[in-house]
C-alpha cells in the first residue's frame, strides 16, 4: 500500500482484525452538500433542479395582479462574488455573504383585449443577501463563526397511534390517526370512549367524522357502503330468508334453530356455530337460511328504501329496523332489504353510530359546520365557505405534503405508487379513516413515533429554503398589491419588488434562530461534532419540558445512524444527538447507514446504504461475525438483527443478507476516538466522548500513543490540518505560507500552476483558544493531493492530539487524590506540557457624542508617563507589549459637559489652555485578573475620517503580504514559461536576434543563458510555428502581469475604502492579547474514559513516586476511581501505552547505537506485522525507515479501533517485546510487566505492593481555575435590595445563604453574623460608615437597618397591610 507524505513519517500500528471495505465518508458532507443543493451556485440555469432557491422561486412566481392583466414571471437567479473573504469578514465583523439577483419578467396584457400582450419588461432585481458557507461547513455572521444544526423532526405523512389506555379510566385503547403535512393544517381523527369517530383540524373543536365525509361529497348511503359489508334479506309474511355467508356465522351463538334447505336442523338454538356446522350447511348446498322476525329487529338498514309506486322514502339508510318499520315495508310490497353486518369482534358499528350523532343534512350543511368550527362568529357566505374548505387541504398555496409526505402517505395506506399530488385527495382522507377503523377492529399495527423511518432530518439547506420562502411570500403580497398600478404608472420590476422582507427573514434565521448556534471551536473535534449534531429541539420540533422518556431513549433504528453514546448530560439528554460515523442522509432526509451485501453466506464488496424502513426487510449480521479468508461466514449460527423490531437473534449463515461495514459504525466521531470503548460503562463512555470536546489545545500537541485510527480522519476533515489540494513540489516555506509548484498533469491549462497556502497564525477561536498552523514540509519535498502539509491546533503530524501522554501511577498518595483529585508532578508544569495559549479580544470604539467626538489619542491628562509607555504616537499599544491588569492599551478621551469651575480650575485653564477639564479619560484598560502579550491590533476607521499613522501602517503591512503572494505566483509562472520556451527554442534555426545573432544559426543553451530573459522574445525563429508559440507565451505572461496588477489594485481599494461601522462610530480598535495559562491546582483534567478530576497539588519531582531506574511518575491517580465507575478501558490503555513507551525506548537505544537499517526493519517487523493489520514496511527506503524510527523513539503509536481493538494476549505480547527480561529487571517490573515496584520520593522506601504504572493520554479541559477565581472588595449593588450582585461577570460577591447563617448561629458567632447581614450586605449607611472608620483608623462597626427589611415592609404594604416601624 502507498503511504501518504505524513503517514510514512509515523505509522500507527493497528490491531484491527477486519480490513476496511468502506472508507469513513467526509465528516462534514451533510452540511456542505445540503447548502450546495440549496444554492445550486455552479449549476447552469437549465440544469437547476427544483430544490432550494429555485424551488422557492418556482413556488411563488408567477405573481398575477388582482385584475389579471399584469403578471410577473421568474426567469433565473444568480449569486455575485462575495465582496469580502472569510478572514476579512471575521476581522471587520461582517457577514460572509453574496448578493442574490433574480431576473424577472413583467408581462402586461391589453385592457381591451386581455388575451393580447401589450408589453414585456425584463430586468434583474436585487433580492437580498444570502450568507455563504465556508469551506469547513460554518457561516460567518457579523464576524463570528456559527453553525446551523440539523433538526430531527416528525416526518410529514400519516400516523396511527393509540393512547396506551391512559385517557379513559377503564384503560380502553383509544385509536387515533393524524395527517401531518410539511406546511398547512393538521388533520386528526380520533375515537372517543364510546367508539364514536371524530375529526379535528389544527387541534380545534372535534366534530363527527361523517361531517368531513359529507363535505367531500359522500351521502350517508355511500359512507356506509365504504365501511360495512351488507347482509341481504328477502322479507316473507313472517320472518325472512337470509343469504348464507359462512364466514359471518362462524363463532356466533345461534339465536334460533338453523335448518338446511331440506328442513333438517343443523344447529340447535343457543349453540355456538363451529366449523363442522358450516361444512354441513355448505355440503347441503344451503344458499338461504330462514330467520325469525326478532332476528331482524334492531338491525340497521344499509340503504334508503323507497316506495316503488309513490317514490316516498319509507326508511333512511342507518335507520334501525323496528316492528313498525317492517310492517310499513311489507305494506308497501318491499321484498329485498340490506342491513349492515356488524359483530363485537372485528366488525364494529362505529361509523353507523357516528352517523347517528351527526345532524348535518347534506354537503353544504357539512361545509358550513366546518366553517363555523374554523371561524367562529363569522357569518358563513357560500363563497367564503367554499374558499375556506378548498384552502384547508386542496390548495397548493396553503397546503403542501411535500415529496416525503406523499411517499409516506402512499406507503402507509398500502399503495404501490410513490408519487402523487402534493395536496390531500378525497381518497387519502377516506383510506386513512378506513385504516383507522380497521385498527379499532383489531387489524393492523399502530406506528412507532420514535422509529427513524418516521423522523427525518432537516438540514441547513432545507431550513434556509423555508426561511427564504417565507420572506418571498411576504414580497409576493406587496407585489400583488402594486401590480395593478404597473401599467398606469409605467413601473419597472425593481419598482415593485422590495428585498427587505427576504433579507430580514434570512438575517433573523442565521442570526437568532434556535438552530443557529455559536460554533464550539475549543478544538478540532468540537467543531466537527457541532456540525454533525442533530437536535430534536427548535422551531417545529420538541421542547425540553414536554419531551418524555420514549423520545429520548435509544431506539433499535438508531443503529449505525445516530450515536447511542454521545448526548449531553442534563435536561437535553437524548434530544440532542450526534450522527454516527458512517451515516448519511438520503434524498428524502431519512438517515441511512451502509451495509455490505452477503450472498449465499459469502461477503461481497457491494456496499448499500439502507434507511431504517428498508433495513426492516433484511437480516443484518454484526461486523464481528467470523469470516474466512475468502469472505465466507463460517459459524453455524451468526448473531443478526431481523424484523421491524430489529431484535438480535442467532440465525443460520444462509439467511444473512447484509453485514455491518465496520464495528465502529454504531458510534459517532467523538465516541470512536475512545480506545477500548468496549470495556467502558456506557455512562462513563458518554462523559469521555463529551469531555474530549472540551480539551484545550496545548502549546505542543502530542499524539495519543494509544488511539483508534480515527484521529487522522477527524484532523483532516475538520479543516484544522492543511491538506494539499493538488500534488506538486514544495517551492517555498516559511512560518506563514507554503508555496507549491503544481504537477503538470494536475495543472489546468491557462491557469497559474501554483498553490499558495496562507497559514492561520495565532488567531482567536470562538472559545478564545488559540488557532495556529505550522508547516510540516521542507523546500524540495514532493507532496501528493490530499497530503497534510501543515499542522493546526491540537494536531500532530496530521493526527488529532487533544492532550498529552503522561506516565500515570494508580495509587493513593497522602489523600491528595481523594475523591478523583489528581496529583501532578512539577516537571509537567516546568516542561510546559499543559500550557495553553488563550487569545482575548479587547475592543474600544470612539463615537460621536452630543458634546463632540471621542478621540483616540496618547495625549491624556492626569496620567503618568509610565502608564503611557506602551502606547505609540496614535495612542494604541505596540505589538509585543507585555501588559498587566489595569494597564492602558488604547488611550481615549471623551468630552464631558460644562460644569461650574472652581477658582483653582479656572487658574489651571488660564495657564494650560482649554484642554484640562473638558474631557474625561475613558481609555481601554486590561480587565482585572488578565495579563498577557499584545499580538495583534486592528484599527477600523469610518469612511471620510482621516486615518492615523497606525491604521496606515497596518494597511501597508497587509498590502506587502499580498504583493509577496502575487510575486511568488508570477515568479513560478514565468519560471515555468521560460523553461518551456528553452525546450522549444534550443536547436531551432533563426532568422536573426539580439546580440548580432546571424541568420541561419541554431540556438544553444549557452546563448539563451547569456541573454536577458525578456530579450528571448526578440529572437526571430525561421519556423513560423515556433514564432507563433513564442508570441503566445509572451502574450500569456503579459496578460498574467496585467491580471496580477488588477488583483493588487482591487485589494488596495478594498483596504483603503472606509470600514462599515455601526452608526455613530468614528473609529474602532481591536487589541488581541495572548494569555499563557499554565497548569495549576483547581484546573480540571480528564482521560478519555470519563475519568475526570481536579488538580489538587503540584508536587516537586523529588517527592513523586519513582521507579527503580529513577524515572518519576508524572501523575498519580486514585485506584478507587476505577471499580465503581466500571471504566476499565483506562487500565487497558495504561498497559498498552506502557508497551508503546517501552518500544519507543528500545528504538531510541538502537538509534543511539547507530544500528543498521536492516536491524531496525527487523524490530519494526516484529512490532507491526505479527498481529493485526499488516504494514508494508518494504515500500519504505532506508532513509525513510530511519526517519520513521526517529519519530517513534518517544513511543510507538497504536490504534485499537472501537469494538475491534487489541486483545489481552496482544497487549501482553507488546509488553514482552518492549521490556525484555534485562530491561524489566532494571526497571523493577513484575513478571506480568503490568506493574512496577515504586519508591516513595520522600523517604526512598519501596511501597508495600507493586503499582499499576503506564502511559495514559490525559486532557486539560476548558474549565480553568483562572476563569473562575474571583474576589471582590467593593462593586456594584442590586437596585432594589441594595445587596451585592452575584457572579464573576458582574464583579459580584459571595452569596452568604440560609445554611451559612445557621452555621454561624450554631457557633454563636453573633458579631460575625451581624457584620455579614448588615455592613457586608445591604446596610447602605453602615457601609459608608465602615469606610469612613477605616480611613480614620478606627476599626469599629455601626450596624444599621438592612435595606432588605425595608423591601419586606414595602412588600407587606403591597398586600394592603399597614406596617410601620416603631422607633424609640
UniProtKB/Swiss-Prot annotation:
The keyword Ligase does not apply. Gene3D superfamilies: 2.40.50.100, 2.40.50.150, 3.90.1100.10, 6.10.140.1670, DNA-directed RNA polymerase, beta subunit, external 1 domain, DNA-directed RNA polymerase, subunit 2, domain 6, RNA polymerase alpha subunit dimerisation domain, RNA polymerase Rpb2, domain 2. One of its GO terms (cellular component) is DNA-directed RNA polymerase complex. SUPFAM superfamilies: beta and beta-prime subunits of DNA dependent RNA-polymerase (SSF64484). Keywords: DNA-directed RNA polymerase, Nucleotidyltransferase, Transcription, Transferase. It catalyses: RNA(n) + a ribonucleoside 5'-triphosphate = RNA(n+1) + diphosphate. Its EC number is 2.7.7.6. The keyword Nucleotidyltransferase applies. It comes from the Bacteria. GO terms for molecular function: DNA binding; DNA-directed RNA polymerase activity; ribonucleoside binding. One of its GO terms (biological process) is DNA-templated transcription. DNA-dependent RNA polymerase catalyzes the transcription of DNA into RNA using the four ribonucleoside triphosphates as substrates. Belongs to the RNA polymerase beta chain family. The RNAP catalytic core consists of 2 alpha, 1 beta, 1 beta' and 1 omega subunit. When a sigma factor is associated with the core the holoenzyme is formed, which can initiate transcription. HAMAP family: RNApol_bact_RpoB. This is DNA-directed RNA polymerase subunit beta. It comes from Ralstonia nicotianae (strain ATCC BAA-1114 / GMI1000) (Ralstonia solanacearum). The gene is rpoB.
Amino acid at each position: 500500500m502507498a503511504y501518504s507524505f505524513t503517514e510514512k513519517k509515523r505509522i500507527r500500528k493497528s490491531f484491527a482484525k477486519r480490513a476496511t471495505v468502506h472508507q469513513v465518508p467526509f465528516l462534514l458532507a451533510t452540511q456542505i452538500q445540503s447548502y450546495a443543493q440549496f444554492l445550486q451556485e455552479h449549476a447552469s440555469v437549465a440544469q437547476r433542479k427544483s430544490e432550494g432557491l429555485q424551488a422557492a422561486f418556482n413556488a411563488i412566481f408567477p405573481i398575477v395582479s388582482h385584475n389579471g392583466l399584469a403578471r410577473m414571471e421568474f426567469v433565473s437567479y444568480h449569486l455575485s462574488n462575495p465582496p469580502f473573504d472569510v478572514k476579512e469578514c471575521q476581522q471587520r465583523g461582517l457577514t460572509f455573504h453574496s448578493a442574490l439577483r433574480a431576473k424577472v419578467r413583467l408581462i402586461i396584457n391589453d385592457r381591451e383585449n386581455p388575451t393580447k400582450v401589450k408589453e414585456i419588461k425584463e430586468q434583474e432585481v436585487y433580492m437580498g443577501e444570502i450568507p455563504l458557507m465556508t469551506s469547513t461547513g460554518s457561516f460567518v455572521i457579523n464576524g463570528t463563526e456559527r453553525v446551523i444544526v440539523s433538526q430531527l423532526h416528525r416526518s410529514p405523512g400519516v400516523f396511527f397511534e393509540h393512547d396506551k389506555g391512559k385517557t379513559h379510566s377503564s384503560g380502553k385503547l383509544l385509536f387515533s390517526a393524524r395527517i401531518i403535512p410539511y406546511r398547512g393544517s393538521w388533520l386528526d381523527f380520533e375515537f372517543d370512549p364510546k367508539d364514536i369517530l371524530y375529526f379535528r383540524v389544527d387541534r380545534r373543536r372535534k366534530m363527527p367524522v361523517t361531517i368531513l365525509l359529507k363535505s367531500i361529497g359522500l351521502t350517508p348511503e355511500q359512507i356506509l357502503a365504504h365501511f360495512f359489508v351488507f347482509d341481504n334479506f328477502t322479507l316473507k309474511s313472517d320472518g325472512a330468508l337470509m343469504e348464507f355467508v359462512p364466514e359471518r356465522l362462524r363463532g356466533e351463538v345461534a339465536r334460533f334453530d338453523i335448518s338446511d334447505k331440506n328442513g333438517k336442523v343443523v344447529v340447535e338454538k343457543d349453540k355456538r356455530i363451529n366449523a363442522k356446522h358450516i361444512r354441513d350447511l355448505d355440503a347441503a348446498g344451503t344458499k338461504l337460511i330462514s330467520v325469525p322476525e326478532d332476528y331482524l329487529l334492531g338491525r340497521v338498514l344499509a340503504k334508503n328504501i323507497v316506495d316503488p309506486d309513490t317514490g316516498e322514502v319509507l326508511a333512511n339508510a342507518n335507520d334501525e329496523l323496528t316492528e313498525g318499520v317492517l310492517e310499513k315495508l311489507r305494506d308497501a310490497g318491499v321484498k329485498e332489504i340490506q342491513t349492515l353486518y356488524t359483530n363485537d369482534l372485528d366488525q364494529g358499528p362505529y361509523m353507523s353510530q357516528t352517523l347517528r350523532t351527526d345532524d348535518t343534512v347534506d354537503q353544504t350543511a357539512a361545509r358550513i359546520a366546518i366553517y363555523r368550527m374554523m371561524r367562529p362568529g363569522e357569518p358563513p357566505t357560500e363563497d367564503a365557505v367554499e374558499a375556506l374548505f378548498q384552502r384547508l387541504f386542496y390548495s397548493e398555496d396553503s397546503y403542501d405534503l411535500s415529496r416525503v409526505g406523499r411517499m409516506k402517505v402512499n406507503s402507509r395506506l398500502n399503495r404501490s405508487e410513490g408519487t402523487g399530488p402534493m395536496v390531500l385527495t378525497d381518497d387519502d382522507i377516506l383510506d386513512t379513516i378506513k385504516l383507522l377503523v380497521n385498527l379499532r377492529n383489531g387489524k393492523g399495527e399502530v406506528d412507532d413515533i420514535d422509529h427513524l423511518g418516521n423522523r427525518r432530518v432537516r438540514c441547513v439547506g432545507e431550513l434556509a429554503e423555508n426561511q427564504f420562502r417565507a420572506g418571498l411570500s411576504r414580497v409576493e403580497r406587496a407585489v400583488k398589491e402594486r401590480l395593478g398600478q404597473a401599467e398606469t404608472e409605467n413601473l419597472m420590476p425593481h419598482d415593485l419588488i422590495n428585498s427587505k422582507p427576504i433579507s430580514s427573514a434570512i438575517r433573523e434565521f442565521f442570526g437568532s434562530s434556535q438552530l443557529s448556534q455559536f460554533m464550539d471551536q475549543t478544538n478540532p473535534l468540537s467543531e466537527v461534532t457541532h456540525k454533525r449534531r442533530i437536535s430534536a429541539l427548535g422551531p417545529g420540533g420538541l421542547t425540553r419540558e414536554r419531551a418524555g422518556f420514549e423520545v429520548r431513549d435509544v431506539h433499535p433504528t438508531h443503529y449505525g445512524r445516530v450515536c447511542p453514546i454521545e448526548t449531553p448530560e442534563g435536561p437535553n439528554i437524548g434530544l440532542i444527538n450526534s450522527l454516527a460515523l458512517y451515516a448519511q442522509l438520503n434524498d428524502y432526509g431519512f438517515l441511512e447507514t451502509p451495509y455490505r451485501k452477503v450472498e449465499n453466506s459469502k461477503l461481497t464488496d457491494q456496499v448499500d446504504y439502507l434507511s431504517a424502513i428498508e433495513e426492516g426487510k433484511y437480516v443484518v449480521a454484526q461486523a464481528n461475525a467470523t469470516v474466512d479468508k475468502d469472505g465466507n461466514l463460517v459459524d453455524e449460527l451468526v448473531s443478526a438483527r431481523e424484523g421491524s423490531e430489529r431484535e438480535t437473534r442467532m440465525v443460520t449463515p444462509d439467511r444473512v443478507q447484509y453485514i455491518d461495514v465496520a464495528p465502529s459504525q454504531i458510534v459517532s466521531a467523538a465516541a470512536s476516538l475512545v480506545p477500548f470503548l468496549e470495556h467502558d460503562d456506557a455512562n462513563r463512555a458518554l462523559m469521555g466522548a463529551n469531555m474530549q470536546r472540551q480539551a484545550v489545545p496545548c502549546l505542543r500537541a502530542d499524539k495519543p500513543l494509544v488511539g483508534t485510527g480515527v484521529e487522522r480522519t477527524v484532523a483532516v476533515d475538520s479543516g484544522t490540518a492543511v491538506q494539499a489540494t493538488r500534488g506538486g513540489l514544495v517551492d517555498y516555506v516559511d512560518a506563514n505560507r507554503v508555496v507549491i509548484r503544481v504537477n503538470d498533469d494536475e495543472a489546468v491549462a491557462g491557469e497559474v500552476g501554483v498553490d499558495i497556502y496562507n497559514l492561520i497564525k495565532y488567531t482567536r477561536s470562538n472559545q478564545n483558544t488559540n488557532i495556529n498552523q505550522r508547516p510540516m514540509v521542507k523546500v524540495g519535498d514532493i507532496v501528493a493531493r490530499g497530503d497534510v502539509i501543515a499542522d493546526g491546533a491540537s494536531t500532530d503530524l496530521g493526527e488529532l492530539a487533544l492532550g498529552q501522554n503522561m506516565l500515570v501511577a494508580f495509587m493513593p498518595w497522602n489523600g491528595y487524590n481523594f475523591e478523583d483529585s489528581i496529583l501532578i508532578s512539577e516537571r509537567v508544569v516546568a516542561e510546559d506540557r499543559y500550557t495553553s495559549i488563550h487569545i482575548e479580544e479587547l475592543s474600544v470604539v470612539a463615537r460621536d457624542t452630543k458634546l463632540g467626538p471621542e478621540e483616540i489619542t496618547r495625549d491624556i491628562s492626569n496620567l503618568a508617563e509610565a502608564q503611557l509607555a506602551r502606547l505609540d504616537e496614535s495612542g494604541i499599544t505596540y505589538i509585543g507589549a507585555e501588559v498587566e491588569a489595569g494597564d492602558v492599551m488604547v488611550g481615549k478621551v471623551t468630552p464631558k459637559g460644562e460644569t461650574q469651575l472652581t477658582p483653582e480650575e479656572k487658574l489651571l485653564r488660564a495657564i494650560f489652555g482649554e484642554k484640562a477639564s473638558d474631557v474625561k479619560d475613558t481609555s481601554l484598560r486590561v480587565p482585572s485578573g488578565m495579563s498577557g502579550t499584545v499580538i495583534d491590533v486592528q484599527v477600523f476607521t469610518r469612511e471620510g475620517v482621516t486615518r492615523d499613522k497606525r491604521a496606515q501602517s497596518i494597511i501597508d503591512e497587509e498590502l506587502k503580504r499580498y504583493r509577496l503572494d502575487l510575486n511568488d505566483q508570477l515568479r513560478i509562472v514565468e519560471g515555468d514559461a521560460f523553461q518551456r520556451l528553452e525546450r522549444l527554442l534550443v536547436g531551432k534555426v533563426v532568422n536573426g536576434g539580439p546580440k548580432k545573432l546571424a541568420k541561419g544559426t541554431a540556438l544553444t543553451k549557452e546563448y539563451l543563458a547569456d541573454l536577458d530573459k525578456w530579450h528571448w522574445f526578440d529572437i526571430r525563429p525561421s519556423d513560423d510555428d515556433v514564432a507563433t508559440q513564442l508570441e503566445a507565451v509572451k502574450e500569456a505572461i503579459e496578460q498574467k502581469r496585467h491580471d496580477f496588477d488588477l488583483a493588487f489594485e482591487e485589494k488596495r481599494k478594498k483596504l483603503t475604502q472606509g470600514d462599515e461601522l455601526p452608526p455613530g462610530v468614528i473609529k474602532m480598535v481591536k487589541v488581541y492579547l495572548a494569555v499563557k495559562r499554565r497548569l495549576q491546582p483547581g484546573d480540571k483534567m480528564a482521560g478519555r474514559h470519563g475519568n475526570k478530576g481536579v488538580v489538587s497539588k503540584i508536587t516537586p519531582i523529588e517527592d513523586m513516586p519513582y521507579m527503580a531506574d529513577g524515572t518519576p511518575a508524572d501523575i498519580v491517580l486514585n485506584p478507587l476511581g476505577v471499580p465503581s465507575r466500571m471504566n476499565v478501558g483506562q487500565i487497558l490503555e495504561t498497559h498498552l501505552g506502557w508497551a508503546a513507551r517501552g518500544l519507543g525506548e528500545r528504538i531510541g537505544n538502537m538509534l543511539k547505537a547507530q544500528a543498521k537499517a536492516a536491524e531496525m526493519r527487523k524490530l519494526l517487523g516484529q512490532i507491526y506485522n505479527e498481529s493485526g493489520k499488516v504494514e508494508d514496511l518494504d515500500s519504505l527506503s532506508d532513509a525513510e525507515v530511519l526517519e520513521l524510527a526517529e519519530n517513534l523513539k518517544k513511543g510507538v503509536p497504536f490504534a485499537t479501533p472501537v469494538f475491534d481493538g487489541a486483545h489481552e494476549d496482544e497487549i501482553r505480547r507488546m509488553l514482552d517485546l518492549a521490556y525484555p527480561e534485562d530491561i524489566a529487571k532494571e526497571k523493577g517490573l513484575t513478571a506480568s510487566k503490568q506493574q512496577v515496584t515504586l519508591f516513595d520520593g520522600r523517604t526512598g522506601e519501596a511501597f508495600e505492593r507493586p503499582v499499576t504504572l503506564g502511559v495514559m493520554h490525559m486532557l486539560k479541559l476548558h474549565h480553568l481555575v483562572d476563569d473562575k477565581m474571583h474576589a471582590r472588595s467593593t462593586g456594584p449593588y442590586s437596585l432594589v435590595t441594595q445587596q451585592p450582585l452575584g457572579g464573576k461577570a458582574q464583579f459580584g460577591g459571595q452569596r452568604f445563604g440560609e445554611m451559612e447563617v445557621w452555621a454561624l448561629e450554631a457557633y454563636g458567632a453573633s458579631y460575625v453574623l451581624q457584620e455579614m447581614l448588615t455592613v457586608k450586605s445591604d446596610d447602605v449607611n453602615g457601609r459608608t460608615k465602615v469606610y469612613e472608620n477605616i480611613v480614620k483608623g478606627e476599626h469599629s462597626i455601626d450596624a444599621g437597618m438592612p435595606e432588605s427589611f425595608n423591601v419586606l415592609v414595602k412588600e407587606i404594604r403591597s398586600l394592603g397591610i399597614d406596617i410601620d416601624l416603631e422607633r424609640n
